[in-house]
Amino acid sequence: MTTFLAKGELNEMEEQGLIQSFEYTYELAWTTLKDFFEDQGESAIFGSRDAFRLAFKRGLIEEGEVWMDMIKSRALTSHTYNEQTAKAIAQSIRGTFFPEFVKLRARLETLTRQTG
């Protein structure tokens, strides 16, 4: 995702690549959280919404609404393609989603160092 974000304006193909990168990163984020919480004895995580809510409750993420917006955007990328929707999602990735992924990664790396 950083490769796309380092560029200025994206053409349509690059924008599609950015969105696909978001989809992959989103899936990786919630499944990593699921694994993290299962390692701590949590067993009631059945999807991304559960994982993000628990992460918010436990202080791993701070911007709960942004993560809920990610769920909506991820669903849109799976079920429809509309140029305006794609542009709006790409803007959200650049402006709010990517920084949240970076914060989550840093938080998990810190926790890993503290417990490892």
Regions found by a protein language model. Give the residues of each.
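Solvent-exposed interaction patches of small proteins and small membrane subunits
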Residues: 1-116
